[in-house]
Amino acid sequence: MWQKWADVTQGHVAAPGPGDFAQMVAVLRKVLEERQPCAPEQCDERSALEGALRLATEHLHRALPDGGQGMSSLQEAARLADPAAFSIPASHRARGGTLVTSAKRAFVNGLEPFHVEMLRPQGNFNRALVRVLEYLTVHRALGLRDDVSSWAVAQLEPLAVPTRWVVGSHRGRVAGALVGFAKRGYLYTLGPVLEAVLQGQARWNLAMVEAIRAAAGAQAPGEAEARRHVADVEALREPLAGRTLPGALRVTQPLWGEVLRRQSRFNAESVLALANLLGTRTAPPQPPSLADYPAWCAAREPARVTAAQEAVARLSRRPLISLVTPVHDASEAFLRECLASVSSQVYADWEWLLVDDASTAPHLARILREAAERESRIRVLTASSEGDTARATNEGFAACRGDFVGFLGAEDTLSPHALAEVALAFLAQPELALLYTDEDGLDAQGHRSAPFFKPDWSPDLLRSVDYVRHFLVVRRETLAQVGGLREGFDGAQGHDLMLRLSEATSSIGHITEPLYHAREGSAASASRGAGLDTATKAGVRALSEHLARQGESAEVTSPAPIQYRVRYPVRGTPKVSIIVPFKDRPDLLRTLVDSLLAQTRYPHFEVLLVSNNSTRPETFALLEQWVDPRLVKLTWDHPFNYPAINNWAAKQASGELLLFLNNDMEVVDPSWLDELVSQAQRPEVGAVGCKLLFPEGTVQHAGVVVGMTGFAGHPFWRLPEGPISTPFGHTEWTRNWLSVTSACVILRREVFESLGGFDERFQVCGSDVELGLRLNAQGLRVVCTAQTRLIHHESASRRADAIPEADYWLSYAAYRPWLGPKGDPYYNPHLTLTATDCGLRRHPEDGEQLAVRTLGRDVPSARDVRGEQRARAQRHLIEHLEAWDFTPEQAQTSRESAPAALAALRAKGRVETATWFVPAFGHVYAGIHTIFRFADLMQRRHGVRSDFVIYDQPNVRPGDIEARVAAICPGAVGAVRVLRRPEDVALLPACDLALATAWTSAYRVLHHPRAGLRGYFVQDYEPLFHAAGTPSALAEQTYGLGFYGIFNTPGLYEHVVGLHGMEGAWFEPAVDGTLFHPRRPPRQGPVRVFFYGRPGNERNGFELGLAALAQLKRELGPAVEVLAAGAEWDPEAYGVRGLVTNLGMLPAERTGALYRECDVGLCFMFTRHPSYLPLEMMACGVTVVTNDNPTNRWLLTHGENCLLAEPTPSGVLARLRDAVSNGALRARLGTNAAERVSRTSWEAEVDRVMKGLLNTGAHPAATLDDRASSLEHAS
């Protein structure tokens, strides 16, 4: 992924999409979580990773398409609360769809202002309802049961009538009055019409108010009452459903339906949120409707045919495909349709063997003869004997010349691109030995129906049903290897062949297109097809022989026609450890344990009941009642982490098999554990789940589809159990999946341990799916058996909002390989991902796009990006607070011992060793340069050996620091040490003086046990670096520890000592006279103004300076030239192109020359720190314009060596005008400025500090003038 991003910058590949950025975010979040808590040696790395996370998150949000789906019904309702955010989808109709869509859009968009007014009261009700539902959801989650029904109803009832219109306008008085008049006229003229349209919505509103009244009461409604309220609002959620508008309005009903489309979706999500609040379920959904399946096909297949035709045209090799069709008394019309479908194939390299299998119908011979005469690729054979379809088919196969052989029924048809898709698939995957396609049914009128969209190769599904069915295409040599069809398996020949093929090869492909159309109720199948009973018996025999050939001892039965159950034997009686985590809910726990002990027939098991932070007395009383020796009671009282609880419990378990089971289950099938054990013992199987049902008999779990709902979902969820009709079959078949839910899953211990158990980075959701994905990656199957079931007492409404955000990101990273266009191999890309009913896919998004929309819009970090970043920064700070800490006793000891330590040093009369605590640095910036310059002069002039301790970056190399400093102050460096851990400060050698150089280092100096005097080299007032809060307070505390201060500038000394009463000395900074001097070159031309502009540093007043300079340039034009430097920024982006020239970052040696080429220098200093910038410009004879800062008055005197300005645009502009227009003023100020700076030298300042420290001369503080504001002396 990272290589892809790198390649983009070089133009090698297409730019990353939203899915790629989401993957980057997911991986970065995972890496950051792995670095919690932050270790000192990883601090810089973690900061860099957080910066990368911010960048990737910004790219993700910029790349997102509009739309999305909320994580929970309540979030989705909030997103849909504005009913007037119209969006009309394209019609699904194949004919006339464009016209219908245009009419709807014309009606909705053309009258949009009036529709907005019409729906405004309803929008107000929607927003109020969301607020109430949010409040009640939080209220109940906290366990509060006070009666808030009066408040809740008062929020909703006054807004419940959607036709109480009050028209206003945001426009001016005249225009607003006209617009308001038009809207009022529309509403009142059409009032009766609109009331009829909104009557159904009004009833829904009132029903919802009554439901909220019940939900907000002191007593929770009972189950029956809760279901009744949910059913009431559910029945009314479609505003126009079941209603016919009066009179002439009927013809416009579909148009009004589009106006209310979004409101209908809001109603549906609100009903789910209400059901969740009441702890009940909505009414079960119906199996998906397939009424529009022909139109669905017509809208999609022409493009597929064209694409296949174009792909075939590009082929350099076209293999020959042989079709074999036994013909016996087929309908003339249907046979001609079959012939026409093959003749119209867009792939031309085929042959067709039509085998006349003793037909008696007089038209058959004529049709077959005509077909062969008309088409040379058709050959007609006569079967050698009568009445055996398998033998006739094999005779056709024996005559084939093609590379691949396919089987086609005489009355069935193929899509025009069927053979093209087959050829393309075999050429794209030359390892394939065979493939099959999706299919549908064909009635007598030629209408397509009953589609069956199949999964990819699923061996356990094939043992439940012949799901491959029609249009199996096999490599000829593979078919010869297994001997073709076998006689004696009437009605199950295809199933038997597929089972034998699966024994010969695992290279089985699947084309996910309905290319085969099987005739329903044909004459041929009725006259010659085996009856269901015969076919079922043949299928049982085929499966039994297959298992015997595979060396598997198992019993095959048939629970329903042409459906099978393979009952694998339990080998021995291995012990099963059933692991049940729980927190209270004694009612659920009693149901589970009592039913498990009473119902389970399997004899050898233990139940590990793992309490996680249970607190209710009833729970503990229940546990005390149970004395069955099979019950093992454990406690895991740590913060909830579902995979961690189960991993820990698995280590306590003694069984060979581990069964993870939710506490809200109920056992109803005595053989449930026998079935799970028998499946789990199969060596090719990694994990086994089973069917879970809600108490009312609908499906809660029958497998997991990765990509459904964007992450992972349960197909058939809440559909009735049994052989219901969906395009994906039903839940009566045992299937393979990528995963099953850990609510009930069994694994062999050695398999579980070889995987390392569940991934504990997950907390609540996703670890079970991720485990299944790892099992599949290792070549082990995941099975969901349909042969047993449990009752799952889980809430049936969505609770995705209860899932930690980290689980979403971890899930995305794990699931992504199966989220794209191909999707989950055990599902089908033509089936819906936005619902769980396995209906037709009518949405364009794949699983990745759905997931990315959730991640980019609906998870907490997406809804509050700044809050997420703030949380990460604050968490980082919290993890380091231990290093920035002292007790009151430690602070008091430091303050009380400071005078004695200072007196002892002064009595000694010299400083022999100093230890400086400095932060790690990459380049030598001004503050660092001052520290090492000071140390260098202390050594050369006063004999002080200085050692340096890098305290904040454990991974830095001492040699790197030495090399960086040696270039500027070769005599400054003594020993350089790096603190690998905070406690390593105790190992430092003794020193006369230990100096902190930043507030973070003051805590290390405090804990230095062998420091003589503790000092503080103060170059800024660091609390002002932060907003008032924790960092600011932590910084401020360091000035009250009794350290001896050495202050950079008298102004900073005055400020800090005035606030905190520190004792210490100050020094004036000097400049490097070789770089900064007043020997200015002669220059002519416009007055040149320099501005130190850094947009990313707020204390430099970038906006204020840029505004004043741009205006100055506009006023004076070519008479003035404005230059800026200090950072890279684009003048065009700030609207000053042509007014200001930005030179960007300049090396130090270049800045002095630049200053001497400028006449006026503008800079600002809004904090208490000393700035070297005015010093350097003054040393070069520049007229400095800056703000009046009290801490800089030791240097700056208005009208004498600078111009001080009030920090407003006009104030700064006035001083700039004075400086630019008055050359004599500039000359005088520049000369005085250079002279003032030249008075100071580093040598003298170091001597001053040492005298003050050792009390060998006048205290520096005594020489400070109590200067009045120099602004008071202006003019």
UniProtKB/Swiss-Prot annotation:
Pfam families: Glycos_transf_2, WsaF_C. GO terms for biological process: lipopolysaccharide biosynthetic process. Gene3D superfamilies: 3.40.50.11090, Glycogen Phosphorylase B, Spore Coat Polysaccharide Biosynthesis Protein SpsA, Chain A. The keyword Cell cycle does not apply. InterPro entries: Glyco_trans_2-like, Glycosyltransf_2, Nucleotide-diphossugar_trans, WsaF_C. SUPFAM superfamilies: Nucleotide-diphospho-sugar transferases, UDP-Glycosyltransferase/glycogen phosphorylase. Keywords: Lipopolysaccharide biosynthesis. Involved in O-antigen biosynthesis. This is O-antigen biosynthesis protein RfbC. It comes from Myxococcus xanthus. The gene is rfbC.
